[in-house]
Design a protein with these regions (language model features):
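Short, surface-exposed patches at the edges or C-terminal ends of soluble domains, predominantly
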Residues: 55, 88-90, 131, 170-177
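Short, internal strand/loop/helix patches
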Residues: 102-149
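Conserved helix-turn-beta segment immediately C-terminal to the redox Cys motif
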Residues: 22, 84-104
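Short active-site neighborhood of thiol/selenol oxidoreductases, capturing the structured segment around
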Residues: 60-87
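N-terminal "domain-start" segment that seeds a small globular fold
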Residues: 8, 12-15, 24-60
């Protein structure tokens, strides 16, 4: 009887861990973005983005690099620009890994010429030709949502309008190594 109790003490945690794992729970895994379900691959979907110079955005780059897509709501102005600047700063804070992240802005850029010029320092400006990303574009004026895309074109996380840039940075540090 005593041996059975000892075996149960060791088996019970394994059974609980197995049940939690089977139910999909993962310890300590908490991202700031929302998972994109069902999973989307922009290469497989042939999602076309036309850049300002007329070229197409290459989802699969010559080097494995992530893409952060910023999707602007209507009338990108002060708040929108502040968020975009925060994202560009977060990219710089990746230090030696900042070259592993490309920044792509889709939508109408800010009307202010100074802000537009400042933006083009860090961001590639383009547009979603077929509107396949329309579901992720915020409806709120002067806002931005973001989508983090893996180097193979798989969309990982959605950061809806109003997201916190430090949370985005924490997630990027976890996945961009």
């Amino acid at each position: 009887m005593f041996l059975l109790l000892v075996a149960l003490v060791f088996a019970a945690p394994m059974l609980v861990a197995g049940l939690l794992s089977w139910s999909g729970w993962q310890p300590g895994v908490k991202g700031n973005g929302h998972p994109i379900l069902p999973q989307r691959n922009f290469v497989a979907e042939q999602l076309q983005v036309r850049l300002g110079d007329g070229t197409s955005w290459p989802w699969r780059d010559s080097e494995p690099r992530f893409t952060l897509i910023a999707l602007a709501g209507p009338d990108c102005a002060a708040q929108c620009f502040e968020t975009l600047t925060g994202i560009a700063k977060a990219r710089v804070m990746l230090n030696r890994n900042q070259s592993r992240l490309r920044l792509l802005y889709l939508g109408t850029p800010p009307a202010d010429p100074g802000r537009r010029a400042a933006m083009q320092t860090y961001w590639k400006l383009g547009r979603d030709i077929d509107g396949k990303l329309a579901a992720y574009v915020p409806a709120t004026p002067d806002s931005v949502s973001a989508v983090l895309v893996e180097s193979n074109g798989t969309a990982l996380s959605l950061y809806p309008a109003g997201f916190e840039v430090p949370g985005l940075l924490r997630d990027m540090v976890k996945v961009i190594r």
